[in-house]
Structures are given as C-alpha cells and as structure tokens.
Amino acid sequence: MQFKPAVTALVSAVALATLLSGCKKEEAAPAAQAPQVGVVTIQPQAFTLTSELPGRTSAYRVAEVRPQVNGIILKRLFKEGSEVKEGQQLYQIDPAVYEATLANAKANLLATRSLAERYKQLIDEQAVSKQEYDDANAKRLQAEASLKSAQIDLRYTKVLAPISGRIGRSSFTEGALVSNGQTDAMATIQQLDPIYVDVTQSTAELLKLRRDLESGQLQKAGNNAASVQLVLEDGSLFKQEGRLEFSEVAVDETTGSVTLRALFPNPDHTLLPGMFVHARLKAGVNANAILAPQQGVTRDLKGAPTALVVNQENKVELRQLKASRTLGSDWLIEEGLNPGDRLITEGLQYVSPRRRGEGQRCHQRQEAGRP
C-alpha cells in the first residue's frame, strides 16, 4: 500500500494534461467561413409580351367548279394540281345540241322580226289591229331573249375557272355526263397566296390581357401590334410576317375560345390549307418587367416557385414568388422580387434560410452572368 499516493498523482497528471490539450484544440479551431454564392441583381426592363396560339391554315378563296349546262365532257384542259388563271378553260362539254338551239333561235328571230316590221307598216294603213301588231312585236322580243339564252348556254359548254389558284383533282373524266345543279363539283380551286391562319385564344387569356392593358400593367405594342409570326409544325419560323385581320364577335360555346384570323403572304406556297401551326401575336409591352433566371427559381413541396436572395446584411432570405410564364431562359415574375434584389443563382446547395431574422450569412463573389 505504499504505492497508492504515487498512482493517484500519476492519474491526476494525465487528466490535467488531457484537459489542457482539449482546451488548446478548441482555441485553435478556426471559425466556419460564410459560403460564397453567385447572384444576379434584378433590374426592371421593357419586354414585349407575346402569345403563342394554335391554329390552322385555310385558303384565301375557294371555288367549286360546277357545270351550268347538261352534257357529255369531251375534254379536260388542265393538269391536276397545277395553277390556273381566272377565265381559263377547264373543260369542254359537247356543244352540238346548243349550237343547233342557237341556230334555231337565230332563224326564229329573223322570222319574228320580219313579221313585226310588216305589221308595223300594216298598222299605219290600218290593215291590222293594234292587238295583232302588239302580238307580233312581243314574239320578236321573245325570240331575241331566246337567242340570248341560246348564246349563254353555248358559252357555258366551255367550263371556265371562276378564280385564279391551284386546282385539285378532277372528279369527272372525258365521257362523263354532267348536269346543271348536280351536287358533286367537277373540281375545286383554292387561292393560296395570300393565305389565312385561324387561331383560337381562350376567353380567360383575352380577359386578362384586357385587364392588364386597362390597369396600365401592359401598354399597347405600338404600330406593329397587329403583326403576327408563324411557327411551322417542324418548329421553324415562317419567313413571311402576317397581319391580324379580325377576331370573332362571339365565343365558341363548346371550347370557350375566340377565333382570330391572320393573313399571310404565301408566294412560294409553303403553307397549304389544313396545316397545323402556331401564331405568335404581340399582346403588349411591360415597361418594368421583372425577369429572373430559371436557375435561380426553385419549387417548394407544394410546387410553388421560390427563390433565395441576399439581403443588405448579406443574409439569405427565402421569397415566395408568383411567376406567370417562361420567356426564353427567364421567368416573368409578377410578385416576390423587386428591383435591386440580389437573386442567388449559383451555390444554392451551400446556403439555406433559417428562422426569420437569423438567415445564414454568405459572401457574394463576382456577380453571376445570365445564361
């Protein structure tokens, strides 16, 4: 038992040394540095708001070629799918019957005209009654009308193009019998230059646009407000620019939308009737638009857009946003961001907001550029 005081002293010395060593390590540990983040300073800018609406093309003019007399088709004088001019002959209907009718009408007119002239001389001599003269003169007028009708029928045996445009397939061939008033058209001609594009806009979008214009949030897009651009089915931009012609005065009850019609030059016939397209219309100008890069906007668990900003104390703040649409690589922000706010776009994984007034401190490195 003589060694007990020595053992106790040794244990005390080791414990003291361990305690002193731990204190030195705590004193030597450096303070955690605030993370560095990249930010974009929000600046208001003028932006022309556009609406991209779905639509379909339709011909500027459409005319169905129909016979106006009865007969057998002798010739078809056009190539299907070709361009035809107004007044160009398309078909020849057998004119034999109508030529005979015209000859008979001419002979009848000569006879009635001669009779009327003779009766005129006789009435001066009081050899015939006034009634007989009037009847002879009426027959002359009737013969003149019959001659004119026969001339028209003979002219109608040449079926002409009612408009200029591209003609489709022929529904009748040589030897087919056609008749005036038949239900089937012989062919259809469509004028493709210019060409219509009919697009639809929901009444909700239309009402919102009107409210924004009335409140001053949007301004009219100026002299080019009626200009329209066209995006084709393959995503390419149609090289010709069109103009808005009119909007429908009633709402479609089944779709709740309004039809807008635009007119486009189509000299190369790139656009064909029935094509599905998207039209870009200038809706208005927001003179103080707030645009936020998409990489600086995230979604919370409910799907609502949020953003982290650096306040004047270099602390991180969480902002709830109201974003209306994407514009290229940016979001158009309606609520939640103000001019001068520093939006964090890089280093989001290193920072997080805490309780109100206790946001995490951070250092701003060189301002991040927009994509």
From Swiss-Prot:
Q: Where is the lipid attached (N-palmitoyl cysteine)?
A: C23
What does the record list as coiled-coil region(s)? 115-155
Question: Which keywords fit this entry according to its UniProt record?
Answer: Antibiotic resistance, Cell inner membrane, Cell membrane, Coiled coil, Lipoprotein, Membrane, Palmitate, Signal, Transport
Q: Where is the lipid attached (S-diacylglycerol cysteine)?
A: C23
- Induction cue: The arpABC operon was not seen to be induced by carbenicillin, chloramphenicol, erythromycin nor by hexane, toluene or p-xylene.
Answer yes or no on keyword Heme.
Answer: no
Q: Where in the cell is it found?
A: Cell inner membrane
**One example GO MF annotation:** transmembrane transporter activity
- Membrane-related topology note: Lipid-anchor
* Cleavable signal peptide: 1-22
Gene Ontology annotations of biological process type? response to antibiotic
Can you list the GO cellular component terms from the UniProt entry?
plasma membrane
**InterPro entries the UniProt entry points to:** CusB-like_dom_1 (IPR043602), CusB_D23 (IPR032317), MFP_Efflux (IPR051160), RND_pump_MFP (IPR006143)
Gene3D superfamilies per the UniProt record, alphabetical = 2.40.30.170, 2.40.420.20, 2.40.50.100, Helix hairpin bin (1.10.287.470)
What PROSITE patterns is this protein classified in?
Answer: PROKAR_LIPOPROTEIN
What family does this belong to?
Belongs to the membrane fusion protein (MFP) (TC 8.A.1) family.
Q: What does this protein do?
A: The periplasmic linker protein component of an antibiotic efflux pump. Confers resistance to numerous structurally unrelated antibiotics such as carbenicillin, chloramphenicol, erythromycin, novobiocin, streptomycin and tetracycline. Is not involved in organic solvent efflux.
What's the name of the protein? Antibiotic efflux pump periplasmic linker protein ArpA
Provenance organism: Pseudomonas putida (Arthrobacter siderocapsulatus)
What taxonomic lineage is listed for the species of origin?
Answer: Bacteria, Pseudomonadati, Pseudomonadota, Gammaproteobacteria, Pseudomonadales
This protein's encoding gene: arpA
